[in-house]
Amino acid sequence: MAFEENFLSAQVLYQLSWNGKLEHPHIIDVEYASDQGGLRLRDVKERLTRLRGHGINDSFSWSYKRTYSKTFIWNDLSDDDVIHPLCGSGEYVLRASELIDTNERKSCDVHSRHSNKSMQSSPTMLLDNVTSKQDTIIGDVHFGALESGENRRIGDKLNCLVRNSGANLEEVKSLRGVSAVISQSLPTLYADQEIMDVEKSDFCLSSSDTEISPRPKMTVDSIKPVKDVNLVVMTKSSTVHGVHTPPSPSLKSSTELPFSPGGTKRLWEKEIRKSLFRTRNSSNVNSVSTEDFTAVHMELPPNTHSTHEDNSFWRDSRSKSPSPSSLNELKEVQIDKEEVEQSTSQLIRLLWARWTGGSSKGKRIPYNTCEGASTKIPESKHNSPYRTKSPYKEIRSTHVEGSHQETRQSLAVQSKARVSLEIKEILPPEECMHYPSPMTVQNVTEVASPHAQTDGGGDVCTIKTIVSEQASQPYPEPRDLRTDQGILSEKTPGLHIAVLEGLTSDAPSGPAEAEVDTPLPAVARAKTGNTLSKLKTIASSKPLPPGFHKGTNDTKPVQITPRRTPRNSIPLASPPLVRSFSRDAVRGFSSLAAISLCPDKDSVACTPSPEKTIVKKRINYSAREEMPLVPGLTTLDWEKALQEATTDCLPPPNFSDILQECSICRRTFKPDSLQVHMRGCHPPQYARAFSARASPHVVRC
């Protein structure tokens, strides 16, 4: 018992921090002598050594938690220092941090630096080791394949020479007979290696552009230097040439392949793709040689000179080997150009004969002029703009098409200029001003008659051209159509135009604006000589107005009153607006203005409905807030007083000052509720006289 009285026990909470991590806290019971003045670090370490081993004492530095100026700090400890408990709780809290040995860290750094320097200073030694290992493996594989005993002995000797870097060159030269045996014993290696080389190669076009040759890619084995002198000699000598696979030679032709059929299929697919690319991007004249091209170039007309100059880039960038198919195509192109590039007068005669001949091939498209016939007719057939009846085949190219179009456009411009000159010679400009718009030309049907083709053919063409060119209005007015009929009848006496009744309006009443913007009907009749009248329906590209109904003969315009919207109520060219502000509408903060639109009398009449001025009643909040709080005024003031008392943290107001008492029943009410109560409040005698129930304020006996 006396021994136990000399020692005390305390619970210690400790936490280890090692390897950058913090362990969960642990708690232990530590005994210490009572005469030493308190718990010391030595006592804690002895207890931890018994529990967790001897290494924990020298591996950590210890500190305990204490209070310092109202905060907690960690106080470092040595073995003889006393650990003080926390103020208030009386707990012992320790923390152990892992020690860092600077000597070991320096030794590790020196070792790593030395290893890095050695790696950087001797890269050639590593390469030598790698190459020697690979060569020894190759030598073992190749020479191990020899079947006879004598060859096997020679192979072993050669392997030894390869391993030894100081071998003599004379001993290597004495083994010249080995190459034949090695080449015979390893026939499959060459085929496999060639297949790999061709599959790795990049196929490209040669300079002649007629064959595709594989271009071997550079690999690591071909770039790697060989440091061993013996291996260099072995590679260069003809005796040991079978050890290393020779580079695959370039193929003589794209069809002769010395390897598997699978590679042949892939190579043919690439060749087909490249040939298609050449034929797609090159012109028909590109494959002609220079001699044939100069001979043909002298025979071609001068108009085609620009076309061949544009093709010079494509001709020079491709091969110059001629082929019979390209020569035939060149002849066809030359024939086509000779037929296309005829004189302008002959081209106009061909177009005129086709136009008036009655055939469906040369019919003009609706509302086209004589000038536009050369450009509008080919669009329906998707052919060349100068296509004639000759049965030759057209050949197109994607890259040369632009130059052909320029030549054809220049011819079309020349033809237009000549036709316009003939028109100016026939009619003076004064008479051209009275002709209608191109919409009237839609209603004239071309009827094939002998009189029109022989005598009045030129006049009809001239009239149609002038009518289409000299029109000044997009839609002619119906009252001007009779003058157009007179002009047409004067120029062509055999032509009679019968216009339907819906075109003109004989009624004098009604404003002139009702006839504006009414397009012509889509049906007209044309009579020429004694021939029967033909009816032709033309679909106009512009939409019909609301008054016209599709599929009916009723072509009279129906006046529909348009619905007024903010957009259509104001015309496009609106007159200046007149703004009038009403001062009566201004009330307080709101400044409202009534704007009335007053257009001129010439424009469409628009009378907008008068709008009522909006008058807003202004509430003077500032004056209301400044009013004093009078008890018994309103319920709002009573609630406001309660709210202000709550927000200002003031004592609640005296309700006896706010509430009012009824003089009859002596009950208290809010000011506004009291007035309602007084309407139905009666004395007790009155209540007993008219009701079986007495007033609640009267006590029954």
UniProtKB/Swiss-Prot annotation:
Lineage start: Eukaryota, Viridiplantae, Streptophyta, Embryophyta, Bryophyta
Miscellaneous note of the record: 'Soseki' means cornerstone in Japanese.
GO molecular function: protein homodimerization activity; zinc ion binding
Domain notes: The DIX-like oligomerization domain is required for polymerization, edge localization and biological activity.
Cofactor(s) needed by this chain: Zn(2+)
This protein's name: Protein SOSEKI 1
Annotated GO biological process: cell division; plant organ morphogenesis; protein polymerization; regulation of cell division; specification of plant organ axis polarity
Chain positions of all zinc fingers (C2HC/C3H-type): 658-687
Main localisation: membrane
Domain of life of the organism encoding this protein: Eukaryota
Subunit and interaction comment: Homodimer. Forms long polymer filaments with other SOKs proteins polymers crucial for polar localization and biological activity.
UniProt subcellular location: Cell membrane
Start and end residues of each stretch annotated as DIX-like oligomerization domain: 8-101
One Pfam family in the UniProt entry: zf-C2HC_2
Binding site for Zn(2+): C662, C665, H677, C681
InterPro entries recorded: SOK, SOK_DIX, Znf_C2HC_C3H
